Amino acid sequence: MSRNPFLDPTLQEILQVIKPTRADRDTRITVIDQLRDVLQSVECLRGATVQPFGSFVSNLFTRWGDLDISVDLFSGSSILFTGKKQKQTLLGHLLRALRASGLWYKLQFVIHARVPILKVVSGHQRISCDISIDNLDGLLKSRFLFWISEIDGRFRDLVLLVKEWAKAHNINDSKTGTFNSYSLSLLVIFHFQTCVPAILPPLRVIYPKSAVDDLTGVRKTAEESIAQVTAANIARFKSERAKSVNRSSLSELLVSFFAKFSDINVKAQEFGVCPFTGRWETISSNTTWLPKTYSLFVEDPFEQPVNAARSVSRRNLDRIAQVFQITSRRLVSECNRNSIIGILTGQHIQESLYRTISLPSQHHANGMHNVRNLHGQARPQNQQMQQNWSQSYNTPNPPHWPPLTQSRPQQNWTQNNPRNLQGQPPVQGQTWPVITQTQTQQKSPYKSGNRPLKNTSAGSSQNQGHIGKPSGHMNGVNSARPAYTNGVNSARPPSKIPSQGGQIWRPRHEQ
């Protein structure tokens, strides 16, 4: 395989644009706080907690990534089953409260989905949110992806690049019969498992069974047990991996990723992708996969035998394989920086990068780039698993800048309410960061969202994350047009768009 000398430095340029800034993180935390305020106005949801999950929690989101939010009804108590009908009813109440507040628009109730979801967009920040009820499974999977990303820093970079590439080629939308973002992350995990030498182990080495099955009994106890087992197994793998380290560059891993799945439409007829075992598995020999037929089977390692790629259609699978083939071939042959950008990114990224003059010092003849940790582990601020966030809920650190101490995944995930935390002794080890009101920002003195308008300059942090996007567009959707649900215009934007009020919590500087 010939090596493109400009690929590595160009990938770093792309990552610099798509990786979220601190302002992007703060903006999402502000949206979470605003949703908490609305939640308190819904009588049947008082006492429930707002818990983010998905790419924001796994630290695999881009600057314009959506927010996945779970409204947890039984935080910290026994794990109880919430029926689909009850979830639909509660989301209906929340929908009416969000509409009445005037701070949210493009409201859409996906009532008959496998997991009922309320889709909304925050009025000021223009962040899309998918809200569900008691999505403990999604939260658990997000934490596992975060733990995996801490094993090797190249994992996060490759996931971000693959997601941007997939969006650019219209193959990252489960609603249209292509990949969802979670299945793309699993493909990257599988790629890292099947490299030589392997970068990641089979996920059964990290957790020996379907983790979702262990979410029973007292939630705190169950989650702490999962975290402790995972921490010990990751530590063991990292110590053993030191004997054989894969030093492939990010560009080599990306090119081999596209090459590995370039015939996925052919392999999918006989084999399934199994990150749990870390190898291609014959579908006919796996009885748990047989009852249903899918165009592509990517087993969810944390909820077996669920197919994470069940949305991929046969017709689209052939097109997906063709996109893999073309991308693999062009990345090996193309030497032009702009053509690489055109292959891997969408228009809004291209417009930003094409305006950037590439300095000769950035693109050496040997293709190297002055970027630290190209082959190594996670970035310094992410080298260790997170501190005991739920025990120190007013700590100034945000979720993805953990201090350089401790090395275990979290314990005690479920202390979501600051009232339940005061006076508790510190717990050894670490817990998952629970974003609470006191962590994020102080309560705004303005009630009911009636905050004063404030002019926002084009270069302010509030506009970050919308690079190169025309006004009226958000995440590729024309937000200037109202959306209609069941014949009713539910997308009427507020006549006044409030600015962010109150004192916004800011993280301390990185070490």
UniProtKB/Swiss-Prot annotation:
**InterPro entries in alphabetical order:** MTPAP-like_central, NT_sf
What CDD domains would the database entry show? NT_PAP_TUTase (cd05402)
Compartments it resides in: Cytoplasm; Cytoplasm, P-body; Nucleus
Q: Where is the signal peptide?
A: none
Coiled coil location:
none
A Pfam family found in this protein is MTPAP-like_central
Q: Which UniProt keywords apply?
A: Cytoplasm, Nucleus, Transferase
Paired cysteines (S-S) = none
**What Gene3D superfamilies does UniProt report for this protein, alphabetically?**
1.10.1410.10, Beta Polymerase, domain 2
Q: Name one GO cellular component term.
A: cytoplasm
* Chief location category: cytoplasm
Instruction: Describe activation and inhibition of this protein.
Output: Completely inhibited by 2'-O-methylation on the substrate RNA.
Q: What does this protein do?
A: Uridylates small RNAs to trigger their degradation. Catalyzes the uridylation of 5' fragments produced by AGO1-mediated cleavage of miRNA target RNAs. Acts synergistically with URT1 in unmethylated miRNA uridylation, leading to their degradation. URT1 and HESO1 prefer substrates with different 3' end nucleotides and act cooperatively to tail different forms of the same miRNAs. URT1 and HESO1 act sequentially, with URT1 mono-uridylating the miRNAs followed by their further uridylation by HESO1. URT1 and HESO1 are involved in the uridylation and clearance of RISC-generated 5' mRNA fragments.
Family recorded in the similarity comment: Belongs to the DNA polymerase type-B-like family.
| Protein name (Swiss-Prot/TrEMBL) | Protein HESO1
State the organism named in the record: Arabidopsis thaliana
Q: Which gene encodes it?
A: HESO1
